[in-house]
Regions:
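Cleavable N-terminal export/targeting peptides
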Residues: 1-33, 224, 278
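Short glycine/proline- and aromatic-enriched beta-strand/turn motifs that initiate or cap beta-hairpins
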Residues: 21-81, 85, 91-97, 250-278
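Gram-negative (and chloroplast) outer-membrane scaffold detector with strong preference
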Residues: 77-150
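Predominantly the C-terminal beta-signal and adjacent terminal strand-loop region
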Residues: 180-278
């Protein structure tokens, strides 16, 4: 597994570097320049299946993202920034990372890795920028937990997830406060679903519906930004993330909504992160 992650990371970095280097003379290189970035986060996760926590204790999440970040002046104004970050991530959410006396339940441990993309528009003043964003990712996740005190119903509910890597998706809303050139902090909230089984056709169609909605929202907010770019940056943030939150609420009971399917294992996580851009 470690070899797979290392190989995956190497190919990702190589592809981005190749893109930056292999440019034609007709392309504005600075427009497409992406800078390497490292993001480190800590958060608190609540676990549930169909709204039931199945007696799983809350987990402290530690996460690292390696990626490439692009910030360029948008066509909507000199102080409006178009922000995008493509990344690989590795995370561990464990009850051992959140050792408190008021955290009852079954001890658990989760490892997850995957790829993601975050984007948004922000406002820049000198070296300080406010960059609200939305993010989507695909992940492979393994959950293990202590069955010593688990009931038969709890064991049955978690049987499809225990000890195996499962595919899943997530959405994240956050605000990137760039304090100075190359350093920023982000408060953020993530909903991450882990699927007990893969149903490619239903998953594909559910994702097509989800991203079609995002495409329409992007078109709508672009019209707002033509007239009021600062307000449009935050309208884009609110609409995209409100839409994703609603869509994931519909998926809480059916992982491939609107198609009949079972409930996913869900992580709801509040996080605080910091990013170094080189």
């Amino acid at each position: 597994m470690i070899r797979l992650i290392v190989t995956f990371t190497f190919l990702f970095l190589l592809s981005n570097l190749s893109f930056a280097q292999n440019k034609s003379s007709s392309i504005d290189f600075k427009k497409y320049l992406r800078k390497p970035s490292i993001e480190i986060s800590y958060g608190l996760s609540g676990l549930s299946i169909n709204g039931n926590d199945n007696n799983l204790a809350n987990a402290g999440m530690i996460e690292m993202k390696l990626g490439f970040t692009k910030q360029n002046i948008s066509k909507y104004g000199k102080n409006i920034i178009n922000y995008r970050n493509n990344y690989l991530f590795l995370r561990n959410a464990s009850s051992d990372n959140y050792s408190r006396s008021d955290n009852p339940g079954l001890s658990n441990d989760m490892w997850s890795f995957g790829v993601g993309d975050k984007k948004g528009y922000g406002v820049k003043t000198g070296n300080f920028s406010i960059l609200p964003y939305s993010s989507n990712s695909f992940a492979w996740t393994q959950l293990t937990y202590d069955q010593t005190f688990a009931t038969p119903d709890e064991i049955q509910a978690l049987a499809d997830f225990d000890g195996s890597f499962r595919f899943g998706t997530s959405t994240e809303a956050g605000i990137n406060f760039q304090i100075t050139q190359g350093f920023s902090i982000q408060p953020k909230y993530e909903i991450s679903d882990v699927y007990p089984r893969s149903l490619f056709g239903k998953q594909l169609m559910s994702s097509v519906i989800e991203y079609s909605g995002l495409f329409l929202i992007d078109g709508f907010t672009r019209q707002i930004m033509k007239n009021t770019p600062v307000a449009g940056s935050f309208v884009n943030f609110v609409l995209r993330n409100a839409y994703e939150y609603g869509f994931y609420q519909l998926r809480k009971n059916q992982m491939n909504w609107p198609f009949t399917s079972v409930a996913p294992l869900r992580y709801n996580t509040f996080k605080l992160g910091m990013t170094f851009t080189f």
